[in-house]
Amino acid sequence: MKAIDSIPVGVSGTKSVEVTREMTVAHFQEHMPAVYGTPIMIYHMEVTAAELIQQYLPDGWVSVGVVVDVKHLAATPVGATVTVRAKVLAADDNTVTFEVEAHDGVDKIGEGTHVRAPVEIGRFLKRVQAKTQRMDEASLRKQT
């Protein structure tokens, strides 16, 4: 049985956040308006999707984001509450595909799809550690 076999298609979840100045484009680029930033919206979509399926994954497993295809449709000011919804569209092969949306109480501000891959955390971290070692070795070769 694969880790994704227990993830039900159609299950959905939501997460709400109040937009703070730290979530705005202006926090990162002072000359820009203080509105909810696209990277932060995508982050909230990813977190909502990850938290939704975590309960269905075996112990020692997490999911990592592998594809994001999102449109940011409308600006949202500081103080507004953004609600993100993630819905499982498919759980096949080794990935889970989600429909994601964000609303600010007035407008739909974002929509798209997101794909996550469940991974066994121990194996994943070993691969990251091996890559870190290869990078360190490559850096040493460049210095000589």
Language model: regions and residue ranges:
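Intrinsic-disorder/low-complexity, polar/charged segments enriched in Ser/Thr/Lys/Arg/Asp/Glu/Gln
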Residues: P8-T14, I40, V67, T81-T83, ...
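Flexible, active-site-adjacent loop/turn segments at secondary-structure boundaries
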Residues: E22-A26, E30-A34, Q55, V62, ...
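Catalytic strand-loop segment that frames the active site of acyl-thioester-processing enzymes
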Residues: K2-G37
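HotDog/MaoC-like acyl-thioester-processing domains
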Residues: V78, K87-T144
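Generic structural detector for well-ordered beta-strands
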Residues: S16-T20, K71, T113-A117
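Hydrophobic beta-strand-centered segment that forms part of the acyl-chain substrate-binding groove
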Residues: A50-T83
